[in-house]
Amino acid sequence: MGVMEILVSTLEAVPGYRVAQVLGVVKGSTVRSKHLGKDLLAGLRTLVGGELPEYTEMLQEAREVAEARMLEEARRLGAHAVLGVRYATASVMQGAAEILVYGTAVRLEPAREV
């Protein structure tokens, strides 16, 4: 038996479906920091400007972990979708960031045409 696929959307509704049951807010978070050597390299890059790939990669990985944690919570509730998804980022300390992702877990059913 495969893992149930859960729709993740920033929308508040899914075209062709209606929300049959609101299961509540689900969230996932992680705090990440970079390796000291990579942090020093990124620090040097700030002197000349441009993208800091070390931090871009760190934040992308953190978003993926946070979203997976949110989806695990939604899966435990039996959700079909997580709607109104939002991401938040906060600096916790020098070189470390928290990523939080949250939304509303719902069960869906096909919309009835009138």
From Swiss-Prot:
A Pfam family of this chain: YbjQ_1
Coiled-coil portions: none
InterPro entries xrefs: UPF0145_dom_sf (IPR035439), UPF0145_YbjQ-like (IPR002765)
Superkingdom to which the source organism belongs: Bacteria
Membership in a protein family: Belongs to the UPF0145 family.
Protein name per Swiss-Prot or TrEMBL: UPF0145 protein TTHA1944
Organism encoding this protein: Thermus thermophilus (strain ATCC 27634 / DSM 579 / HB8)
